[in-house]
Amino acid sequence: MSIVYMNVMLAFMIALIGTLLYRHHLMSSLMCLEGMMLAMYIFISLISLNMHFTTMYMVPLIILVFAACEAALGLALLVKMFNYYGNDYVQNLNLLKC
């Protein structure tokens, strides 16, 4: 396994650990999720280009679409939460309240 693949997997693992450790604020959780999506995009792009999988050339674009949707929904939730509560603490997100 080359050093590029190792670096991409390390970036994914660091973003995953960041998601687990810094879950106090919603903004830091969203940034770690974006880091994970970016690492997945780079990894799948490298695999599809190096292995010449012609059927997988569209998969990185689909991942980018999902990452953009996730970012838009996350930022909309962040703005709504900040307007309602005045902070971005994840502990304020309670799905049992209606």
Curated annotation (Swiss-Prot):
Which Gene3D superfamilies does UniProt cross-reference here?
A: 1.10.287.3510
The membrane topology term of the UniProt record is: Multi-pass membrane protein
Enzymatic reactions:
a ubiquinone + NADH + 5 H(+)(in) = a ubiquinol + NAD(+) + 4 H(+)(out)
**Cysteine disulfide links:** none
Localization in the cell:
Mitochondrion inner membrane
Please give the biological process terms from Gene Ontology that the record holds: ATP synthesis coupled electron transport
Q: Where are the transmembrane segments?
A: 1-21, 29-49, 59-79
Task: Write the Enzyme Commission number(s) for this entry.
Answer: 7.1.1.2
Q: Pfam family of this protein, just one?
A: Oxidored_q2
Keywords, comma-separated and alphabetical: Electron transport, Membrane, Mitochondrion, Mitochondrion inner membrane, NAD, Respiratory chain, Translocase, Transmembrane, Transmembrane helix, Transport, Ubiquinone
State the InterPro entries in the record: NADH_UbQ_OxRdtase_chain4L/K, NUOK/Mnh_C1-like
Q: Which GO terms describe its molecular function?
A: NADH dehydrogenase (ubiquinone) activity
Q: Which family does it belong to?
A: Belongs to the complex I subunit 4L family.
Protein name as catalogued: NADH-ubiquinone oxidoreductase chain 4L
Record the organism.
Hemiechinus auritus (Long-eared hedgehog)
